[in-house]
């Protein structure tokens, strides 16, 4: 088996919103990489032994005092270095070039760069040709400052009308700087540039692929837990499902999954989880039907934050009770993924993987004394999904829209009651079914129904009814940080509304939420 960590790229984070995207792109190319804060030590870099280093972008100005710098060792390590945006500016400044503050002439958004010289980074890449025969590339810019003089030994590789050094290189040392963002899709050939860097310039092999990651994870799990028993909280979500499948492959019946049905799940979800993991895949699952316990604890509580805390607390109590019954369990498995690890590390702490444990399960009692197993902690969400497919999990489960941890507890506004949850489940199932039928489900990023605790007058036949209101919500987003409401066709919305009002006795009115984020959040609570 090839070592999936043998070749690797180190990405130093200077605070750009795009940094995780760079890491995901390098992984997509098939090369392992890690994301560390910019202030790492020489010893840490030596220990990691990267085949190449990428200096990412950042919001600071190189011209400001105390702005972040790459460790000097980066330029003496003998490996290729690629500086992106701020990374190019700090590389230039640190190696003897010059950076000036942009005054009113920064470049933000689409730009076309003109190639001035050949470079290994841009080999065979062009989007268009200018009238005087120069290669042109479509790129995405986001910078105020710019390099005004490049270091000795470097050549200008590309320019724009306002930026004389849109790209620079020192081919001898294999140092490259680009003022644009190759990692975003708006830079049309960005993936080819990053691929040139990782595979051709750094000489990495593309060993990082789902089948190899699975083999590696199973080997490591066997080594870590040996013949011990492991306990896992299985929610039916992507992360815990993939952890369950990996552990099942590695240790079989020594894994006990605890599935807690809190009464706040989607229609038939508990049944589907039990059928898939229990009957189909043959996992050892303890099914705890705790609907009444959760609803009793939530009685009379209308505050969203308090509801979240109650749901979390009751889950921990139940999980603790079940874990104590597994007297031989020595390990607790969790679905921690790489963005959780990065978040926990923060900047200015050195190496990004020296972290505080990220407890997805939340505040589990210390007296459990279980070791922690986190087989997904190196993976991004899109990688977890690809691994899930390779492990045989169904596509529609892995690529389902996000569902909040507290479930319908935060989609029923105000106090949560069984009657409200049952109505909401059925209304939501109709909305999702119709989205699939109309081939719209995968065109929106997230869609769901919200129960509003208000009554509205309706007419059914000759009679009047006074029943509840639900709101449909559908958004389009890239990163869930900002979102637009989805412009679903009116006839589609009309069809969904008619079905819900006619088929779900107790709902008399359906509205559509047209709020963006900001100012509204995606979920209502």
UniProtKB/Swiss-Prot annotation:
Pathway: Purine metabolism; GMP biosynthesis; GMP from XMP (L-Gln route): step 1/1. CDD domains: GATase1_GMP_Synthase (cd01742), GMP_synthase_C (cd01997). Its EC number is 6.3.5.2. The keyword ATP-binding applies. Residues 8-207 form the Glutamine amidotransferase type-1 domain. GO terms for molecular function: ATP binding; GMP synthase activity. It catalyses: XMP + L-glutamine + ATP + H2O = GMP + L-glutamate + AMP + diphosphate + 2 H(+). GO terms for cellular component: cytosol. The keyword Manganese does not apply. Keywords: ATP-binding, Glutamine amidotransferase, GMP biosynthesis, Ligase, Nucleotide-binding, Purine biosynthesis. ATP binds at residues 235-241. Transmembrane segments: none annotated. It is an enzyme of class 6 (ligase). Residues 208-400 form the GMPS ATP-PPase domain. SUPFAM superfamilies: Adenine nucleotide alpha hydrolases-like (SSF52402), Class I glutamine amidotransferase-like (SSF52317), GMP synthetase C-terminal dimerisation domain (SSF54810). The active site is at 85 (nucleophile), 181, 183. GO terms for biological process: GMP biosynthetic process. Catalyzes the synthesis of GMP from XMP. HAMAP family: GMP_synthase (MF_00344). Homodimer. This is GMP synthase [glutamine-hydrolyzing].
């Amino acid at each position: 088996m090839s070592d999936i960590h043998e070749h690797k790229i180190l990405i130093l984070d200077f605070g750009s919103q795009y940094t995780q995207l760079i890491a995901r792109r390098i992984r997509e190319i098939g090369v392992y990489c890690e994301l560390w804060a910019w202030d790492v030590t020489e010893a840490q870099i030596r220990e990691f032994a990267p085949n190449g280093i990428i200096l990412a972008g950042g919001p600071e100005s190189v011209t400001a005092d105390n702005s972040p710098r790459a460790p000097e060792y980066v330029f003496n390590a003998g490996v290729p270095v690629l500086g992106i945006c701020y990374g190019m500016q700090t590389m230039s400044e640190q190696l003897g070039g010059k950076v000036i503050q942009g005054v009113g002439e920064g470049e933000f958004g689409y730009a076309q760069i003109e190639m001035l010289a050949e470079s290994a980074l841009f080999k065979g890449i062009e989007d268009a040709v200018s009238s005087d025969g120069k290669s042109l590339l479509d790129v995405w810019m986001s910078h105020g400052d710019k390099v005004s003089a490049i270091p000795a030994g470097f050549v200008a590789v590309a320019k724009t009308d306002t930026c004389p050094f849109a790209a620079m290189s020192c081919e001898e040392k294999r140092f490259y700087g680009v003022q644009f963002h190759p990692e975003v899709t708006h830079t049309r050939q960005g993936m080819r540039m990053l691929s040139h860097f990782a595979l051709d310039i750094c000489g990495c092999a593309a060993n990082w692929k789902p089948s190899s990651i699975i083999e590696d994870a199973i080997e490591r799990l066997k080594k870590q837990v040996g013949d011990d028993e492991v306990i896992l909280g299985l929610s039916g979500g992507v992360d815990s499902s993939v952890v369950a499948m990996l552990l099942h492959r590695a240790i079989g019946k020594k894994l006990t999954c605890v599935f807690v049905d809190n009464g706040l799940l989607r229609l038939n979800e508990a049944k589907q989880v039990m059928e898939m993991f229990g009957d189909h895949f043959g996992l050892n699952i303890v099914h705890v039907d705790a609907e009444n316990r959760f609803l009793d604890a939530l009685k009379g509580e209308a505050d969203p934050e308090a509801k979240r805390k109650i749901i979390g607390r009751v889950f921990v109590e139940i999980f603790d009770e079940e874990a104590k019954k597994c007297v031989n369990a020595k390990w607790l498995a969790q679905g921690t993924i790489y963005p959780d690890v990065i978040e926990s590390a923060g900047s200015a702490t050195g190496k990004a993987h020296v972290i505080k444990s990220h407890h997805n399960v939340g505040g589990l009692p210390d007296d459990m004394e279980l070791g922690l197993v986190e087989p997904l902690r190196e993976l991004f969400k899109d990688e977890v999904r690809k691994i899930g497919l390779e492990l045989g999990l169904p596509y529609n489960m892995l690529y389902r829209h996000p569902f909040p941890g507290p479930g319908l507890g935060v989609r029923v506004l105000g106090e949560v009651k069984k009657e409200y949850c049952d109505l909401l489940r059925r209304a939501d199932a109709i909305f999702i079914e119709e989205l699939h039928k109309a081939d719209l489900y995968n065109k929106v990023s997230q869609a769901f129904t919200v129960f509003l605790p208000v009554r509205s007058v309706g007419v059914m036949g000759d009679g009047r009814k006074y029943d509840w209101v639900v709101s449909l919500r559908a958004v389009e987003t890239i990163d869930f940080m900002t979102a637009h409401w989805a412009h679903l066709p009116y006839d589609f919305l009309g069809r969904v509304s008619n079905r819900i009002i006619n088929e779900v006795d107790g709902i008399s009115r359906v509205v559509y939420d047209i709020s963006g984020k900001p100012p509204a959040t995606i979920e209502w609570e």
